[in-house]
Amino acid sequence: MAEPAPPGESGGERILVVGPSWVGDMVMAQSLFMTLKARHPGCRLGVVAPGWSLPVLERMPEVDEAVALDVGHGEFGWATRRALARSLRGRFDRAIVLPRSWKSALVPWLARIPQRVGFTGEQRYGLLNERRRLDKAVLDQTVKRFVALGLPAGETLDGHVPIPRPRLAVDAANLAELRRAHGLSSRPAIGMMPGAEYGPAKQWPLEHFRTLAEALVAEGFEVRVLGGPKDAEAGEAIARGLEHVHNLCGRTRLADAVDLLADCRQVVTNDSGLMHVAAAVGTRVHALYGSSSPAYTPPLTDSAEIHTLGLDCSPCFARTCPLGHTRCLVELSPERLLAAVLAAERRLPVEEA
């Protein structure tokens, strides 16, 4: 990532993006970054984002500068925002604010950035000077909304928004070290991501993951269970006592997950942030949808298979099943996923030894 440009020394427009607070949304925001670089050659792009997301931003060649906003979830952090804004004064010509909260628009306003663009939301009339009305029926996907803010308003009225696919860089040297450190084998690897930050109505049953892991090992695969520290117990439930199944939840950094997912042949995943990471490194994705909708936040890749039952009660977008049965995920069988993985494997290129 390039060093920040001193005030007035950048050759093109200086654009600051206030980024989202979730892993998947940050990956999807790369589509906006790619659009800005294509539309404004020579521009310098800075991103204000939670500190945890900086390793992901470092894998995006479009980002010239990533600036950490170290404010806890739900915390206002007035002093932190004000200090950050002061450090940014005079350094940017335009700000694009992706979140719709009032506090998200504070830093660009306090930094006195001349043009401040975002969707109308939470009474931000004084903070943004180019407010856009969000028509959710027209801009019907999160990624479309992000990219639209980087385009002239008139270009997106019909909902036709060109979406470049996110593509995260992979660190081969780091991958080699990870393979050594965690004792990973030469077997073809399948990734599993059992977590979903939103809630249990987005989580495939752990017993299904374990049944699938057992079957995949019997077919000659290695299974890597990936997630954060909160997912460690789930990972242990899947991996316990199984040879060639590695519980890496909470044992790797987010940047490590990028490299490990790129090294997998395929992944089986809930609708989660790591699903979007896997899509952005070109790994084939088997995405499990229960309470959420693939129409709204799909994996941005042509190499994906969506697994959903399309029940009358879904998508409900609830954190926990309002009906108490979560049939939308319970009835997605491990046998269905095994068949899908094996069928896809027959179509994928053979790995070089």
PLM regions with names:
Residues M1-A353:
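Catalytic machinery of carbohydrate-active enzymes
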